[in-house]
Amino acid sequence: MQSARVKYGWLNVDKPLHMSSGSVVGRVKKIFNCKVGHAGTLDPLATGVLPVAVGEATKTIPYAVDGLKSYAVTVQWGSQRSTDDAEGEIIKTSSLRPSADSIREALGQFVGNIRQVPPAFSAVRVRGVRAYRLARRGEAVSLPPKEVCIVSIDLLSADEESNTADFLIVCKKGVYIRSFARDLGASLGCFGYVSFLRRKSVGPFSEENSVTLDRLEALADADVLNEALLPISYVMGDALLRLHVDAEVAEIVKKGQSVSLQRTSLNGLYAAENYDMCYLSRVGGVPVAVCKVVNGTARPVRVFDV
């Protein structure tokens, strides 16, 4: 049952194992009965934080994917798999066992701005077709490297008995953790793949305040879904200037018209000198629009129908 009071906002969903991000969106859409989208795909074998936008919040998805992401990952040494995780077929093996010291020494080459080749089994498009579809058909997939950024990699433990290593990785968008495992294993000469992956955070979303799908359905049954929803402004971060407007200005902006920032609160014209974008809301937090700042005016680019 959908709560009549709930129309829009963000959810911090804890994606379960063996479920695709698209399937999570489908479950949430059924609960809320409105448009739903997610920010940042998680592989079916990964768990953890999946930000999900509900209703008008889908207009702010681009702002949610720009934040830093953190992952807890276990790499299994000794073999390379077709998917670079435990799901794929073994294509190479090695009897080498890397020491903790050798792993630490190799990590430096993967920190900072690096070039990374996405896994063959990925959503990257090749001639208009998803790479994983070609790979599943047995076609050879050659993907060009991408410029990505890994902020930090911490080696948490190295177990020579199980031949695994645990890492905490902080990175920007576009990084494939499976590619990191593959490339680190190759550099160590022992091969490697991801045997466990959990996303701990995406921007302001963290696993500590995430909600399971079962919990969402329980809240829906109790008609209190608003308890799980976060405001649209939750994903805005520091890149956008936040300003309050009165009812008159809000109506002008909602018609797609620009307004002078002198008409906003908090001396908007002065504050906007260091910003390219701004987020306008009514007093009380009701969202109005995301606007581009142009010559002292707010020009709407995303208007919220709430």
Swiss-Prot record:
Active site: D43
Molecular function terms from GO: RNA binding; tRNA pseudouridine(55) synthase activity
GO BP term, pick one: mRNA pseudouridine synthesis
Entry superkingdom: Bacteria
Coiled-coil parts of chain: none
Signal sequence coordinates: none
Catalytic activity: uridine(55) in tRNA = pseudouridine(55) in tRNA
EC number: 5.4.99.25
Alphabetical UniProt keywords: Isomerase, tRNA processing
InterPro entries, per the entry: PsdUridine_synth_cat_dom_sf, PsdUridine_synth_N, tRNA_psdUridine_synth_TruB, TruB_C
Physiological role: Responsible for synthesis of pseudouridine from uracil-55 in the psi GC loop of transfer RNAs.
Family per similarity comment: Belongs to the pseudouridine synthase TruB family. Type 1 subfamily.
Full protein name: tRNA pseudouridine synthase B
Organism of provenance: Anaplasma marginale (strain St. Maries)
Name of encoding gene: truB
